[in-house]
């Protein structure tokens, strides 16, 4: 279970999050909803270890992860799909997916069939450059890259942005 207790976050003198607490259980989908500018992305960044919290606790399966850097979080099975289609435009689709393998042992470095089942376009276009894909296809690539590690926790910020409604399931 992911547990957040009394999380405060500041950017300079501005308080972005105040006493946020939540629990997300294994196998559950938890959505953070709110209007623009209320701190959803800041919360994701704090959970992903890319923005330091001012105070509060973040734990996964009872272990404090709030003190870990992003590469250490990846080793613990946490994957992130940031807002804004973070892909490598000059790498092929296949190469982009393979960048998600960073923390996996060599024997486990194969794109799971489930990724291609979710996003068939990635298999069809695996030799095309990421920058040549449409916005929705780039978003599918970003999600696919996060899924190649079969994460224990998947954090996604605006995950369906630009994806055609018939692909969203």
Residue ranges and their predicted role:
Residues 2-4, 17:
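Conserved structural motif at the start of ABC-family nucleotide-binding domains
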Residues 33-35:
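The feature captures the beta-strand-to-loop junction immediately N-terminal to the Walker
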Residues 48:
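Helix-to-loop junction immediately C-terminal to a conserved catalytic motif
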Residues 56-64, 76, 110-111, 117:
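Conserved ABC transporter NBD signature motif
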Residues 129-133, 137:
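Conserved ABC ATPase signature
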Residues 146-147:
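ABC ATPase C-loop
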Residues 150:
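Conserved catalytic motifs of ABC-family nucleotide-binding domains
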Residues 154-158:
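Catalytic Walker B motif of ABC-type/P-loop ATPase nucleotide-binding domains
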């Amino acid at each position: 279970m992911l547990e957040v207790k009394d999380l405060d976050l500041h950017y300079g003198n501005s308080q972005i999050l105040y006493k946020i607490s939540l629990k997300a259980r294994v196998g559950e989908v938890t959505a953070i909803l709110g209007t623009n500018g209320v701190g959803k992305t800041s919360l994701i960044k704090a959970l992903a270890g890319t923005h330091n919290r001012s105070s509060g606790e973040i734990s996964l399966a009872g272990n404090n992860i709030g003190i870990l850097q992003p590469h250490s979080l990846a080793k613990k099975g946490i994957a992130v799909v940031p807002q804004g289609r973070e892909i490598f435009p000059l790498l092929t689709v296949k190469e982009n997916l393979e960048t998600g393998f960073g923390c996996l042992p060599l024997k486990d470095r194969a794109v799971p069939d489930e990724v291609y089942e979710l996003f068939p376009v990635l298999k069809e276009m695996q030799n095309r450059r990421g920058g040549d894909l449409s916005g929705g296809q780039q978003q599918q690539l970003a999600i696919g890259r996060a899924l190649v590690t079969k994460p224990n926790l998947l954090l996604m910020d605006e995950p369906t942005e630009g994806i055609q409604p018939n692909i969203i399931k």
